[in-house]
């Protein structure tokens, strides 16, 4: 059956700021306390979406979350109306205000793990929401992510959506950022590669930075998504790579159809994994980048592997890269050599995503890949599909509501909270989402 990969990109939220909240993500730490530009950030993301949609790649959007998230502050013991709570937390515990104001939901590669209908025992598309429990600011995302995905994938006869795993360390799940699918045509059954950083009883784990994904979580997600057990492989990420800032597998590897593009130091027992994939995937091709051409640290700094690998109609592939790759002499030299060689990757497209990149999120972080048949794609909420009209509407929406300068101190501004809620009210109508946010369901306690 004919199927296509649809990229659902996250819209950057109004409170996009640099707070260094993500230990293990070196870009996040390095840019802490810099001044951000939320308007530029959302426009950079929209330009990438529109350019790829215009090039014939199906593209959709996933909305941002409500931030600052006042219910989390109430749960932490701050009381009063919303404005009083903002004032209290800004004076007493400003770090908590930054945590509940993170725009991290824009990195929707962490929203869920997806199983196409061709791989599922029941023939439905499955999505399991990620619990993201390694970081407090990201652990807040799952309930609203689930609500948003339910408004996008509404047809329960075609889509099965699963709530996040329990919020315990043993079941740490970071979503599609630690998941690859390999195979032939999108509509045919593929092999799903789940990548984890640690497992109970295995002493092989990173020493410096946390391994966010557990094997136990990956196995549970595969069960929830009803992936055919004959089509699943579990592999450990190289702990030494995690300690160099590879906090998700999509910072060191990307796959598309029969191609796995990765660093030679991406996986534990990598040679064995590659040989196993050769026996499981027809026409499998591993493009392993040697350390003497691109080091792990340079791969992390440029997000070479946090790229999108997209199939074109002629069977060749396009590599979508951040500007940082072109700016790095060694990485750009390697990439030009790569596209000149005999392999499916024949073209590159570079995007300026510096606002997201400074927080540690490249092109691949910003998108959730969902393989859909033509019938399944028609069952998706049509209002979220990118086209000329939506691009124009979202740019006008951003111009109306987004600030072009934001610091951590600005998060305490009650006007920012009101601006955000008004913006999301307008957006839910624009994208036909209904009352999906908590403030819309309970009413804002603004005194």
From Swiss-Prot:
Binding sites annotated in the UniProt record for substrate: 19-28, 110, 137-138, 212, 250, 359
Key words, A-Z: Arginine metabolism, Hydrolase
UniProt-listed InterPro entries: AstB_sf, SuccinylArg_d-Hdrlase_AstB
Its EC number(s): 3.5.3.23
GO molecular function: N-succinylarginine dihydrolase activity
Catalytic reaction annotation: N(2)-succinyl-L-arginine + 2 H2O + 2 H(+) = N(2)-succinyl-L-ornithine + 2 NH4(+) + CO2
HAMAP family in the cross-refs: AstB (MF_01172)
PANTHER family tied to this protein: N-SUCCINYLARGININE DIHYDROLASE
Record family assignment: Belongs to the succinylarginine dihydrolase family.
Stated role: Catalyzes the hydrolysis of N(2)-succinylarginine into N(2)-succinylornithine, ammonia and CO(2).
Name of the protein in its database record: N-succinylarginine dihydrolase
Name of the gene this protein is made from: astB
């Amino acid at each position: 059956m004919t199927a296509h990969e649809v990229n659902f990109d996250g819209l950057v939220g109004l409170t996009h700021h640099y707070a260094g909240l993500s230990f293990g993500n070196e870009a996040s730490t390095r840019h802490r306390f810099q001044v951000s530009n939320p308007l530029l950030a959302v426009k950079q993301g929209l330009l990438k979406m529109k350019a790829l949609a215009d090039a014939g790649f199906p593209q959709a959007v996933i909305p941002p979350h409500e931030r600052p998230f006042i219910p989390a502050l109430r749960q932490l013991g701050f009381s009063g109306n919303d404005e009083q709570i903002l004032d209290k937390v800004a004076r007493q515990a400003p770090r908590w205000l930054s945590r509940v104001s993170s725009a991290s939901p824009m990195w929707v590669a962490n929203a869920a793990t997806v199983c196409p209908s061709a791989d599922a025992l029941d023939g439905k598309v499955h999505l399991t929401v990620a619990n993201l429990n390694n970081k407090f600011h990201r652990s807040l995302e799952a309930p609203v992510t689930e609500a948003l995905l339910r408004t996008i994938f509404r047809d329960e006869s075609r889509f099965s959506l699963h709530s996040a795993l329990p919020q315990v360390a043993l079941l740490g799940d970071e979503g599609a950022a630690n998941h690859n699918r390999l195979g032939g045509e999108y509509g045919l059954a593929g092999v799903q590669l789940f990548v984890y950083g640690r497992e109970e009883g295995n002493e092989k784990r990173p020493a410096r930075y946390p391994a966010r994904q557990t094997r136990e979580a990956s196995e549970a997600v595969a069960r929830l998504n009803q992936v055919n057990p004959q089509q699943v492989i579990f592999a450990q990420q190289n702990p030494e790579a995690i300690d160099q800032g590879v906090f998700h597998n999509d910072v060191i590897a990307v796959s598309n159809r029969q191609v796995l593009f990765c660093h030679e130091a991406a996986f534990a027992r990598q040679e064995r994994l590659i040989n196993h994939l050769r026996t499981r995937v027809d026409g499998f091709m591993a493009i392993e980048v040697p350390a003497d051409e691109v080091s792990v640290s340079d791969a992390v700094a440029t997000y070479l592997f946090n790229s999108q690998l997209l199939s074109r109609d002629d069977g060749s592939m396009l590599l979508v890269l951040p500007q940082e790759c072109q700016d790095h002499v060694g990485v750009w030299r390697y990439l030009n050599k790569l596209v000149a060689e005999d392999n499916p990757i024949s073209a590159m497209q570079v995007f300026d995503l510096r606002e997201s990149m400074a927080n540690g999120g490249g092109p691949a972080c910003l998108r959730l890949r969902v393989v859909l048949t033509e019938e399944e794609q028609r069952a998706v909420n049509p209002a979220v599909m990118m086209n000329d009209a939506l691009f124009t509407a979202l740019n006008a929406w951003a111009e109306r509501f987004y600030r072009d300068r934001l610091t951590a101190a600005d998060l305490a501004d009650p006007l920012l909270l009101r601006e955000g809620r008004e913006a999301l009210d307008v957006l839910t109508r624009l994208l036909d989402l209904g009352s999906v946010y908590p403030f819309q369901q309970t009413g804002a306690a603004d005194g």
